[in-house]
Amino acid sequence: MNYSLAVDIGASSGRLIVGECNKKIQLTEIHRFENQIIEKNGQFCWDVDALFSEIKTGLKKCREAGIEPVSMGIDTWAVDFVLLDEHDKPLTDAVSYRDPRTDGVMEEVIEQFMKERLYLETGIQFQQFNTIYQLYALKKQHPDIFKKAKSFLMIPDYFHFLLTGKKANEYTNATTTQLVNAFTKKWDKDIIEALGFNPDMFQEIKLPTESLGKLKSEWVEEVGFDLEVILPATHDTGSAVVAVPKVADTIYLSSGTWSLIGVENSFPICVTKALDYNFTNEGGMNYQFRFLKNIMGLWMIQEVRRNYDNRYSFAQLVELSKGISFKSTVDVNDPRFLKPTNMIKEIQRYCQETGQQAPELPGEVAKCVFESLAESYTSAVAEIEDIFEKDFKSINVIGGGCRNELLNQLIADRTKKDVFAGPIEATAIGNLVAQWMALGEIESIQQARKLIYDSFDVKRYVSADRE
C-alpha cells in the first residue's frame, strides 16, 4: 500500500496527515502543531522557520511510525509571500495579511487603475490585504529592499522550494494575488509593470498535480527517506473545494479561520453585479473557478477564546451559547475585527454604536459571533442566487467549522436550506487527491468525489421551520 502525505497549514494550526487510497480513503494524523502570528520588528509576521521545522518533525514521525509516503504536498492560507534576494535568502520577515501596513493602500492602487478594470482582468475580490496591496506597501515603505527582490514565492511555494530547491508559483494560490489574468491564467504583466513591480521575480505558474521532484539530499539524510513533492491546490480552500462530495445545485462553505462561501464554475464571472457584491474568482483544480466571497470566519471566536485566557474550549463556548435568545449581530467583515486589540470589547463597542444590546456573558458573546456569521452566510447565499438567477438546494459545510452543530443549525434556519456538514479534513483530502491524480491512482475529480462521498460521514441539518 502506498501512502501520500498532506501538509495542511492554516492560519491557526497545521497538521500532517497520511492518506491511503483504496476502496475507501483512510486518513491518519501524524503530527499537529499551532501556528500563531508573532510580532517582530514592529510587524505581525509568520514564523516560517518554525513552521518548516514542524514539517520536518512530521516527516521524522512518519519514519518513526514505519510509514514512508511516496509523495507529499503542502497547502496554506493565501495572499502572503516571501521575497528572496539574488542568493535565494529571504529579504524580509514573512509579514502577515493581518498587519496594518496595507491600511489605505488599496484605495491608492485603485486611484491608478479603475476598480472595474482590475476586476475585469483579474476577477478577484477587493480586500485590503491582497498580495497586490502588500507588495505595493512594501515598495512604497521600503523601496531599497523591494529593489533587491529577485524571486516571489507564496508561503507554500517557499516551503516547496526549501524542500526541493525548485521555484514555482502554484496556480490556485497565485490567483489570490490579484495579479493573475483570469482569462489568460498567466501573470498580468500590464498590471505588474504599471505598479512598478519587477515582472522577472514572478515564477512560472504551475498547476496542481505537477511534480517538483524529490527532496534535497540534506533533507533525505535528516528525515531518513525520500519522496516526490507534488503540487496540490496550495491555497487551502482550493484543496478543500476538491473534497466537496457533491457540487450540483450546492453552495459550499469552507469553514475555518476564514469562511469562504461560493460555487464551483467553469469560467470567471467578472460582471458588475459580482463586483458590487465583492465576489472573487479564485483558481481551482483543472482550471475551474471558485466563485466565492471571503467572510471573517471562526477567527472571531478564536480571538474571543484567547481574550478569555483560553478558560473555555470551543465546545464549551458553543454549549454556553445554546438556548440563549441573544440576537445582537455585528458585521463580521468590518475591518475593525481583522486584528483588534481585544475582540470581546470590539464586539461590545460595535453593538453599542449600532444601538444594540452589548453581550456581557461568555455565552452571549459566543452567540453574537455565531448569529453574525450565520447572518453573513445568508446574505452571501442570496447574492449568489441573484447573480446566477437560480435557487441552490443545499449548502455543504466543509473543514473544521463543520463540527459546530449550533452554527450549522443556525445556517439551516436562516437560509431555509438543507445543510450538509463534512468532511472535516476536506483540505487535507483535496491535497491528497491532487497527489493521487498525479500518481495515477485516481483518474478524475469526479471519481475522487464519489470516493470521498463513500468514505466519510456527512451529517444533514434541516431548518426548524421544515422539520
Swiss-Prot record:
The lineage of its organism: Bacteria, Bacillati, Bacillota, Bacilli, Bacillales. The keyword DNA-binding does not apply. NCBIfam families: rhamnulo_kin. Involved in the catabolism of L-rhamnose (6-deoxy-L-mannose). Catalyzes the transfer of the gamma-phosphate group from ATP to the 1-hydroxyl group of L-rhamnulose to yield L-rhamnulose 1-phosphate. The active site is at D236 (proton acceptor). Transmembrane segments: none annotated. Its cofactor is Mg(2+). Keywords: ATP-binding, Disulfide bond, Kinase, Magnesium, Nucleotide-binding, Rhamnose metabolism, Transferase. HAMAP family: Rhamnulokinase (MF_01535). Belongs to the rhamnulokinase family. Pathway: Carbohydrate degradation; L-rhamnose degradation; glycerone phosphate from L-rhamnose: step 2/3. Substrate binds at A78, H235, D236, T237, N294. This is Rhamnulokinase. It comes from the Bacteria.
